[in-house]
Amino acid sequence: MHDDIVYPGPEGTHTAAAASLLHEGARLVPLAGFRAVADAVAAADAGGGVLPIESSLAGAVAETHDLLYERSLSIVAETVLPIRHMLAGPERIALDSIRVVRSHPMAFDQCRDLLAQLPGAARIAVSSTAEAARLAAEDDDASVVAIVGEDAASLYGLTVLADDVGDHTAFTRFVSIGRHTRLDVDEAAARTAFSFVTKHQPGALHAAIEPFARAGLDLQRLVSRPLPATPWKYRFDAVVAGHPLDPVVRGALRDVRALTRELRVVGVYEGHEEEQ
């Protein structure tokens, strides 16, 4: 398993699709959740892992951010996939006959218009849209359906009752994670991910990010995460366009390090082509 690529299962998830794109030809192994993936990579029990890190509708995936920091892992690649939801079940049924809808909580949140058309249907949250598809396939009751992705519907042989049921066009960013930071990345397309903890004083965050503006660098993402051991204090995860060995980027990071309590680079990788 040491060369396998792991992802939060089961099969048929959008993360599985992202893993196949990021690691073409590799053996993909589903594990029981985000934490299991991070632990396997950190312990060198897997060659790498794939996790979702950002939704265009729901924002940052907090668990992924926290696991990368806590396990000292690094982002080595990214991809962005369109997320298309569909309503599917074991057989064709009228929408007004549906009693139960299963899906992941994020899918429920992204399909509110559909759910408004099913006021009498109970909602049951499960661990993934693929798990919802599996349960629907195993259920003998046609009135129990699921909001799933195309791959999961096909994998479990479900009948599509309504296609493209999301309220808005949605995309999710997925990252490939490893134990070490790579530097062999095309500088023109490079992104540098880093985490920092500010000093606990007024204006500390503004001071910490000002070096990037002064250097004319594009700070593409900034996510705040609480520090559990120190209530009301926060860590910031950020991405800047550029390579950390580029003199301008290196200088900005050096300035930020001098202004913060902690700074660590947590990934160097090629940015998704739509953002280049």
Q: Model-flagged regions — what are they?
A:
Residues M1-Q276:
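Domain-level signature for soluble enzymes in the chorismate/prephenate branch of the shikimate pathway
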